[in-house]
Amino acid sequence: MAIEVRPATAFADVKTMVGPKRPDANVCWCLSYRLTSSKENQGLVGPARGKRVQQLVRQRPPPGVLAYDGDEVVGWAAVHPRADTSFARNRKVPHVDDLDVWSVWCIRVRPGHRREGISHHLLAGAVDFARSNGAPAIEGYPVDNKGAKLDLTMAYVGTMSLFEQGGFAKVADTDSVLNGFPRVLMRLDLR
């Protein structure tokens, strides 16, 4: 298995990774944090959510990276400048300085491909993507689960251990809690 991580420019593959099973569903598409306006997020319903993601995929930079095993898409990581996300105004996640930092907030591995190290490839790919687009630093907001089992539906934020293994360091606590675990701010300087 040779995993390759590429910018998310193929809408069909993004849809495979984060699109809902029902086209009229009002969930996922990895938009909740990507959109800076909660009003826009709540106003996008059903197929309009997918159309918005289709627009984002055509923009430069695209909204994240995809992992492939050969021609098969097996993973997704959302990564973009923090200023273009809801983290720009999030009161629970602190800003530690004024750098134009990038954020990685969702790491998703396709069922049937979990426990193969793909999340590590995705995080490394997100770092490379941010660096190639001029990011001075990249940060994530994983849970500090201290090795305890994490509900699979909440694992999308990653774990502190994953980010540490990717070279990130904890720089701050947050006021955010997910699945009963505190989230921490992890950062990697890219300068």
Which ranges hold each PLM region?
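Conserved GNAT acetyl-CoA-binding A-motif
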Residues: 123, 130-155
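Conserved N-terminal entry element of GNAT/NAT acetyltransferase domains
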Residues: 1-38
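Conserved acetyl-CoA-binding loop-helix of GNAT-fold acetyltransferases
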Residues: 104-109, 115-132
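C-terminal "cap" of GNAT-fold acetyltransferases
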Residues: 153-166, 172-191
